[in-house]
């Protein structure tokens, strides 16, 4: 283990108790602590509306293994048309959420327009690439006019600060250090999250990763990793309930699903 990795682990663990002090007792309806009465393995029994969490056939997250994907160039380049929009930042106790109040743009899948509605943060990452879990996952939740849902996930490893989170730090601090659970974040630009040119990506059918674990969600997981600083991840952890400091749902079985993979088109001066 490198000295840099040891430092990052020390930084996070040394401030763990400050995370606990910000617990919100009214947000303990479910927990991410495995083995607890309201932990992930019991979500499906906590509420009749959450039964899919326990008996669903297309649950997320999953391990995305390159040796099990179907290479599908016909998926085409990721088509997005995002734009800056007014938003709030909300702490629901389980995660931090950017909630757009005006049109933040869209993603297009199979000629269907999915409008960006909100953005969630999970640490560590929920999805795993070839058995490796990363330090943060950002999930961009979209909805079509006929109420179909699609989520685009970007995974991050420790490194340089993420510019999108940098712009939100003051607002994260506000909802972490006060009784407020939602603040006006002004204008937020989601284009900062997807600054990759023609990224390779995985596509599969899954579910939301928190109760009620609704299925029939089209997932797009970007293969290229972003970077985030340990301090930024720590800010997210400090803001949430003590039961959600590590708010990543355990991996779910793939079962009979197919994972499709769009391989980025290489150029003479570029590579995946």
UniProtKB/Swiss-Prot annotation:
Coiled coil: none annotated. Residues 1-25 form the signal peptide. Keywords: Disulfide bond, Lectin, Signal. Full hemagglutinating activity after 3 hours of incubation at pH 3-9 at room temperature. Disulfide bonds join 53-213. GO terms for molecular function: disaccharide binding; hydro-lyase activity; maltose binding; protein homodimerization activity; zinc ion binding. The hemagglutinating activity is stable at 50 degrees Celsius up to 40 minutes, but decreases to 50% after 80 minutes. Loss of hemagglutinating activity by EDTA treatment. The activity is fully recovered by the addition of 5 mM Ca(2+) ions, but not with Mg(2+) and Mn 2(+). Hemagglutination activity is inhibited by maltose and its derivatives, with maltopentaose and maltohexaose being the best inhibitors followed by maltose and iso maltose. Not inhibited by glycoproteins. It comes from the Eukaryota. InterPro entries: Alpha_CA_prokaryot-like, CA_dom, CA_dom_sf, Carbonic_anhydrase_a-class. Expressed in tuber (at protein level). Residues 28-263 form the Alpha-carbonic anhydrase domain. GO terms for biological process: one-carbon metabolic process. This is Dioscorin DB3L. The gene is DB3L.
């Amino acid at each position: 283990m490198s000295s840099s990795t040891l430092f990052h682990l020390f930084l996070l663990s040394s401030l763990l108790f400050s995370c606990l002090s910000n617990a919100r007792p009214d947000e303990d309806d479910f927990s991410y602590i495995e083995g607890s009465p309201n932990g992930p393995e019991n979500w499906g029994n906590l509420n009749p509306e959450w039964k899919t969490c326990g008996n669903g056939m297309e649950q997320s997250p999953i391990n995305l293994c390159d040796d099990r994907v179907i290479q599908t160039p016909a998926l085409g380049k990721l088509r997005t048309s995002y734009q800056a929009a007014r938003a709030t930042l909300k702490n629901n106790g389980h995660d931090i959420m950017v909630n757009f109040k005006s049109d933040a743009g869209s993603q297009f899948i199979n000629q269907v327009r999915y409008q960006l509605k909100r953005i969630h943060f999970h640490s560590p990452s929920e999805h795993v690439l070839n058995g490796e879990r990363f330090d943060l996952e950002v999930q961009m939740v979209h909805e079509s006019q006929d109420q179909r849902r699609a989520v685009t996930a970007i995974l991050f490893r420790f490194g340089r600060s993420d510019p999108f989170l940098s712009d939100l730090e003051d607002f994260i601090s506000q909802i972490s250090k006060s009784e407020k659970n939602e603040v006006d974040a002004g204008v937020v630009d989601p284009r900062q999250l997807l600054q990759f040119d023609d990224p390779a990506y995985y596509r599969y059918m899954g579910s939301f990763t928190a109760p009620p674990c609704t299925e029939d969600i089209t997932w797009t997981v970007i293969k290229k990793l972003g970077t985030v600083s340990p301090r930024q991840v720590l800010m997210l952890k400090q803001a949430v309930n003590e039961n959600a400091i590590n708010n990543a749902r355990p991996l779910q079985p793939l079962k009979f699903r197919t994972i499709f993979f769009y391989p980025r088109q290489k150029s003479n001066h570029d590579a995946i």
